Every structure is written in structure tokens, then in C-alpha cells.
Amino acid sequence: MDFNRIITHMNDHHQDDMAVLCKKFGGEKEITDVTLVNVDFAGLDFKYNGGKTLRVEFPQQADAGSIKQVIINLCVENKPVANYDRIKAKIDEFRQEFKSCVLSTLDKDGLPMASYAPIIFFDGKYYIYISAIAEHYENLKRNPNQVEVMFLEDENKAKSIIVRTRLRYKASARFIPREDPIVEKVLDKLAETMNDVGGIKTIREFTDFDLVELTFGTGRFVRGFGQAYLIDANGEISHIGVKGNPHEKESDK
């Protein structure tokens, strides 16, 4: 593998991209005299601003066949966001991948409890179908406005175990009366999602299960280092740490 060709190409044609990486991962407001000095399958080494050095690790180990695309992705994904519509689309796409969600609720002593439940998207709203004997059932009854919902990327799909994509919302819960027609419609949707197997035929007849509507409020979406976004109550997006890398390094203390 001729790493020198990559170094020459980046230094000749991608000064702006390298400056963006140094700003974000080096926590700098201004970048001058940026040079790529070394490349390997784990990351890039830069010099900038009169001799400062910076190592930017790839999200996952590259090889001879993938290193070009890994560098392209690193540069593209860390460009300053000019239009948040693309991020909104990523959030919607990510959320729609899931058939279950992680729940954080408060128990009777006010302590947080983590659990999960199947989640159903129907007619623009989100629902969970839960048993009265589940711990989170009483937690939701007791504290319906103190709930968090998280969608977390599968470890096996993540580029790195420390940068799993995740989407989290503060939420409120509303129990739907069993006689409400929406209950059967949502359960039909759940049965369709599960191909009418996996126990749905049985549990939809249980009277100790309830349908709960979840209303999402503010949230946070994280795709990787320097790619964290706040979601306001209206669904508008803002970038966290826009003035450089928000993480403190040992040398910064």
C-alpha cells in the first residue's frame, strides 16, 4: 500500500477538508499551514498552526481496499452542517429501522429503571404494548411525564463500539382505554410487523396488557465524534460543539 500517494493527494487537493478535521478534532477556531504527515490503516496524522500535531483515528480499522472510502467518509461526515434537513432525514431513517425501543422510567422510590418494549408507528404516532406485570408499567402509570426513549444501533452494525449511533427523546406516556378503536388498529399493525407470529396472536387477547401512546419531546442524536445534535420540542436541529471538538484531551487540562 502506497500511503505516500494518499499524503500527496490530500496535501495537494484537500486543504479545506483537512482544516475542518483539525478544527473539529483539535478544538481550534482557526487553522493555518495544515499538512498531512502520515497515514496508516488506523488514522491520519496532521501538523498545523506552526507545528501542532493531531492524530485523527478512523471510526474503524481500514485496509487497502477500504481506506480511500474511509477517508472520504471521514471528511464528508465532518463538514460543517449548512442544511439540517439532511440530518433530520437521517434521524427519521434511523428511528424507522427499529421495532423496539429502550425505556428509562422512574420506580416508586424515584430511581431510574431501564427496560425495553416493542414500539409501533401508526398514523403519525408511536405506541408501546406492555404487560401490567412488567416493572415499567407501574412506573409509567406513576410518572407518565418522566420517561426517556432511546434507539441504539446494534453493536454488530456499529463502526466502533464507542460511537454507536443513538437517538434519545424525553417523552410522555398516555394509556389508551381498551375500548378505544385505535387499540385494535395499532395491534393489527404490530401483528403485520411481526408477520403474525412471535406470540402477538396470544398477547393481544390478554386483558392485562395495555396500549400506551408515547409523545416525544426534546432529544439528542449522536452519529459519532463531533456529530451530536440537539432536537428541540418542535423537531428543529442544532449542532452541539460547533466551535471545535467538545471533548477535553489530557493535554488541554
From Swiss-Prot:
Domain of life: Bacteria
Pfam families on file: DUF2470 (PF10615), PNPOx_N (PF01243)
Gene3D superfamilies in UniProt: Electron Transport, Fmn-binding Protein, Chain A, PNP-oxidase-like
Keywords: Heme, Iron, Metal-binding, Oxidoreductase
EC number: 1.14.99.-
Binding site for heme: 247
Entry GO MF terms: coenzyme F420 binding; metal ion binding; oxidoreductase activity, acting on the CH-CH group of donors
Role noted for this protein: Involved in heme iron utilization. Catalyzes the degradation of heme to biliverdin, with the release of iron and carbon monoxide.
Family under the similarity heading: Belongs to the heme oxygenase HugZ/HutZ family.
Protein name: Probable heme oxygenase HI_0854
UniProt source species: Haemophilus influenzae (strain ATCC 51907 / DSM 11121 / KW20 / Rd)
Record lineage: Bacteria, Pseudomonadati, Pseudomonadota, Gammaproteobacteria, Pasteurellales
